Amino acid sequence: MPKRIVVIGCGVSGTTAAFHARKTDRTAEIVLIGDENLPEYSRCGLPYAFSGIVPSLNALIGHDESFYEQTNRVKLRLGWDCTGIDASTQRVQLTRPRDGREETLDYDALILTTGARAATMTLPGSDLRGVFTIRTMEDMERLADRLSEVKTKRVAIIGAGLTGSEMAEALLIRQVSVLQAEIFPEILPTILDPDMASIVR
């Protein structure tokens, strides 16, 4: 019986792991599980799609589902959260938030590529409408929807790292007024020395 390889996380690392697993094992069942409803896409391109430099958010998607399912024989399970792993029985617990459905999936090999999460702050008002984190395509769509609803378009960005600075540029291209706040004295504090950061600023 072919072994089952389960990959948790459908970003670049997870997709790469699934495709390499296919190259090394032509007979295994490979299941790639992602919590978003889309296959792998370029997260770093999100601000550029938002600004219009890249034609659309969909242009960031690397491969369509047939490339996974038919070309590489990788089964996609999109829109599922991994809520538990039992290493003793080699089983993962999955939940689909949109309808609450739960499943268990046995594995012979498990690869974890869950990636990062957007940094958030637990400040009063951080849960109000109009407050966003930027990490996913859905985040960008919600921000675009919000900006289309309001007449005066002003955005405050907390953080002047790479994502915050790219979003500031994207918003300015879209004629949105931007205020960017950063705890460090200069922008891109973990990437550039102060002299270079001052030039970029």
Enumerate the language-model features and the residues they cover.
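Glycine-rich Rossmann-fold phosphate-binding loop(s) that bind the pyrophosphate
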Residues: G9-S13, R135-T136, G159-G161
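Hydrophobic residues in beta-strands of the RecA-like P-loop NTPase core, especially within AAA+ ATPase
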Residues: I157-I158, A181
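Glycine/Thr-rich phosphate-binding loops of Rossmann-like dinucleotide-binding domains
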Residues: E40, T120-M121, S165-E166
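Beta1-alpha1 glycine-rich phosphate/pyrophosphate-binding loop at the start
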Residues: P2-K75, A168-D195
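FAD-binding core/adjacent interface of flavoenzyme oxidoreductases
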Residues: M1-I8, I61-G62, S66-R154
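Residue-level preference for nonpolar/small residues embedded in alpha-helices
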Residues: L60-I61, E103, T163, M196
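Short acidic/polar capping segments at secondary-structure boundaries
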Residues: M137-D139, G161-T163, P185-E186
